[in-house]
Regions:
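Flexible, surface-exposed loop regions and adjacent strand-edge segments
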Residues: 132-140, 298-306, 421, 464-469, ...
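Flexible beta-edge/linker motif
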Residues: 67-133, 147-172, 196-198, 203, ...
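N-terminal amphipathic/hydrophobic interface segments
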Residues: 10-87, 149, 156, 205-211, ...
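Elongated, acidic membrane-bridging lipid-handling scaffolds
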Residues: 23, 99, 140-247, 252, ...
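Transmembrane beta-barrel strands of outer-membrane/channel proteins
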Residues: 120, 238-240, 284-286, 404-406, ...
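Outer-membrane beta-barrel translocator/pore domains, especially the C-terminal barrels
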Residues: 126, 246, 285-301, 305, ...
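Extracellular loop and loop/strand-boundary signature of outer-membrane beta-barrel proteins
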Residues: 88-89, 252-256, 420-422
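Extended terminal
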Residues: 2-25, 229-231, 271, 277, ...
Length: 546
């Protein structure tokens, strides 16, 4: 209401201002409503255009977008039900994004920069073994699939801040296997466009945390350069606590490794970029794990190929200037380490329980110095065991010096091994083993010396159901054990000397080494009075006297 006390000119000006204000508000409101309505009409055209843009950048994958909405006033873009599928294995989709939002990062407008802020809510990544196999067989590396370009093509403004809220990642090895599950992933990264620290190698900061395999926790803090090509570079400090190792058993079985129980904790720093790879693990601790390597007749060829491949990989990565790997300390505590041979008749199992192992200074560069290993435990549950020595992991093949002591193992626990390789067993007795194994310049030397005491091979009560030939053989072996017994120590002692050249054009040094030591151990653990066993060539070494 215009006051009547004002002069006519003033009343006119006041009335005009009110009309202009009302007109401006009406027009502005109409524009807002029109823009709001138009934005909804644009949604139908926007969705297929964005979908086509993403697919033009992706290689080997394709995107399907359920809904897209652009608010024209604030330029906020909302995407719903974005699904990414692998062309080779489209089911299940490798990624689903229920909600994605792109908006202007208003804080940066103060500095005169127009950049975007992206948020993902409840994203889910599902990967199975078939998809991983297809990726390995592809000629295009995963990092060159066009992920960065596909994401940046969606929104006209460059992304400078990125956040993930409550993400979920699963890997399924095969039908029926429990998935590997990373849950409750939260990540925030800013300065992606290198605005504030353009001269810094890794200008972007990021933080992340997640639940690992339902019980473990992983936190990440570091810096990145998301503009590096062909893939982003990062340097990350990580802390992992209590990750259950049994979760990876379905995958580890493909390499003949069975894992039961156990928890892994570790901390360190990893730098990975197109120019350099640095892995610096300060500590890794495994508690209460049961690890069994199972040798199978049907996988024998694959096992040999795997050993050769691992050996070549080690040789390739050793002393590479752009690759630096170092593990300061690995501790395995209160665990069981086992070797199962299912290729023999009967099969047998060798194990050390109550294992405590410390491995220090493991690296891939010779100038880092030798690594040290110290292991204690109970061989076959009874033999007090200590293995200690030094080795160089950065050589062209195995290079180390190791001492082994196994005291007073119950010999009856080795009956499956004796039956498999000696075709006899024992009724009682104990075994002590001393060994020294050294490898340098592709030559192996040393000895394995077992000593047996209180051995009783034939027992009329326990062996009454055996055939007459087997009974006779065990009686002869038992008599031979008495003949070859050291009368001072009342022990049967034998020795297998190790010597040889690991260089072989048909097998790797690592494969040759493993085969020599395995054969020597089997030959040594069979009592020296079993003359059917042919020892390897004599070599050097100074074993303890029997």
């Amino acid at each position: 209401m215009v006051s009547t006390d004002l002069p006519p000119t003033a009343r006119y000006k006041s009335s005009l201002a009110a009309k202009i204000g009302l007109w401006f508000a009406t027009v502005l409101g109409a524009i807002v409503v029109a823009v709001f309505i138009v934005s909804f009409f644009l949604d139908g055209m926007l969705r297929p255009r964005l979908e086509a843009r993403m697919n033009s950048n992706l290689k080997g994958y394709h995107a399907t977008l359920g809904h897209a909405h652009l608010q024209l006033l604030t330029l906020r873009l909302t995407l719903r039900r974005l699904i990414i599928a692998q062309d080779a294995h489209p089911r299940p989709p490798v990624a689903e994004f229920p909600l994605m939002r792109f908006r202007i990062y208003w804080r940066e407008l103060i500095w005169g920069r127009v950049v975007a802020n992206v948020g993902l809510w409840n994203p889910r990544v599902d990967i199975n073994r078939g998809q991983v196999t297809a990726e390995r067989q592809s000629k295009t590396p995963l990092r060159q699939r066009g992920w960065q370009d596909a994401l940046q093509s969606v929104y006209p403004f460059k992304i400078n801040r990125f956040a993930i809220h409550n993400g979920d990642i699963t890997y399924v090895d095969h039908a029926g296997a429990k998935p590997l599950h990373l849950a409750k992933l939260n990540l925030v990264s800013d300065n992606i466009r290198n605005i504030h620290e353009p001269n810094y190698t890794y200008p972007s900061r990021f933080q992340a945390d997640m639940v690992v395999f339902d019980r473990g926790r992983l936190s990440l803090e570091g810096r990145a350069n998301f503009l590096m090509k062909p893939f982003p570079g990062t340097v990350t400090h990580y802390t992992l606590t209590g990750a259950p190792l049994s979760a990876v058993s379905p995958a580890s079985r493909h390499v003949n490794l069975i894992i039961n129980g156990g928890a892994l904790s570790s901390d360190g720093t990893i730098e990975y970029s197109p120019k350099v790879t640095n892995v610096d693990v300060r500590n890794a601790t495994i508690d209460s794990v049961n690890l069994t390597y199972s040798h199978l007749l049907q996988t024998e060829s694959a096992e040999k190929q795997r050993i050769t491949k691992v050996g070549k990989t080690i040789e390739k990565e050793n002393n590479r200037p752009a690759v630096n790997i170092r593990l300061h300390e690995l501790d395995i505590r209160d665990s069981r380490l086992a070797y199962s041979d299912q290729s023999t008749d009967p099969p047998y199992l060798l194990f050390i329980n109550g294992t405590n192992l410390t491995l220090t200074n493991l690296g891939n560069h010779r100038e880092q110095g030798p690594s040290r290993v110290n292991l204690t435990g109970k061989f076959m549950g009874s033999g007090a065991t200590r293995i200690y020595g030094t080795f160089v992991a950065s050589g062209g093949g195995p290079e180390f010096n190791t001492n082994i002591e196994i005291l007073n193992t119950d010999l009856t626990a080795l009956n499956p091994l004796l039956r498999a390789h000696g075709r006899f067993d024992v009724a009682q007795g104990s075994c002590t083993v001393y060994a020294q194994i050294g490898v340098k310049n592709d030559r192996i030397g040393g000895y394995i010396k077992p000593m047996f005491s209180n051995v009783k091979v034939y027992d009329p009560q326990k062996d009454k159901n055996k055939g007459i030939v087997q009974k006779a053989k065990e009686m002869v072996i038992g008599a031979a054990a008495h003949i070859f017994k050291n009368q001072k120590t009342q022990k049967v002692a034998t020795q297998v000397n190790l010597t040889g050249n690991l260089k072989n054009p048909n097998v790797s040094s690592w494969e040759a080494f493993i085969e020599i030591v395995r054969n020597a151990f089997v030959q040594a653990i069979l009592p020296g009075f079993d003359r059917e066993i042919q020892p390897v060539r004599a070599g050097s070494g100074t074993p303890p006297n029997g």
